[in-house]
Design a protein with these regions (language model features):
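Short, solvent-exposed loop/turn elements at beta->coil junctions and helix N-caps
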Residues: 6-9, 82-87
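N-terminal presequence-like segments and the immediate start of the first folded domain
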Residues: 1-33, 71, 75, 94-104
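Short, well-ordered alpha-helical segments
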Residues: 21, 26, 34-81
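Short active-site-adjacent helix-start/loop capping segments
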Residues: 29-30, 86-88
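A short, glycine/Asx- and small/polar-enriched loop/turn
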Residues: 88-94
Length: 104
C-alpha cells in the first residue's frame, strides 16, 4: 500500500478515487505513568512513556486506515493526515485518514 501526504504519488497515475479511508484508536493514560509524568514535568524534559504511547497509537491508527483502504479496493492512499482529540479525562483518540485510490 502506497501512502502519501500529498495529492499525488510521484511516478504514479491515480485512475480511480474510492472514498475516505480511516482508522482510529483510543488510548487511556496509566495512573502509574501519570505520577512519573508529573515528576518529569516538574524536572523538565521529554515524557518518554507518553511519546512512546502516542507513536504506537499513530502506527495503529495508520494500520487500521490501510486495512480500511484495502477493503475499499485501494492500492494507495493520498492526502494522509492525522487528527487527535481528547475523548475524556485521560483518554485521547488518534485518527488517521486519507483518500483511498487506485494507482498505476
Amino acid at each position: 500500500m502506497l501512502l502519501s501526504t500529498a495529492d499525488t504519488i510521484v511516478g504514479k497515475k491515480i485512475t480511480k478515487q474510492l472514498g475516505l479511508a480511516k482508522g482510529n484508536t483510543i488510548r487511556a493514560r496509566h495512573i502509574g505513568r501519570d505520577i512519573m509524568a508529573i515528576l518529569r514535568h516538574i524536572a523538565g524534559g521529554e515524557i518518554t512513556d507518553y511519546t512512546k504511547m502516542m507513536a504506537e497509537s499513530r502506527e495503529q491508527a495508520l494500520d487500521r486506515m490501510v486495512e480500511d483502504a484495502r477493503k475499499l479496493g485501494a492500492n494507495a492512499v493520498v492526502r494522509v493526515s492525522f487528527s487527535t482529540s481528547m475523548i475524556m479525562g485521560g483518554a485521547s483518540e488518534i485518527l488517521a485518514y486519507g483518500t483511498a485510490v487506485m494507482v498505476e
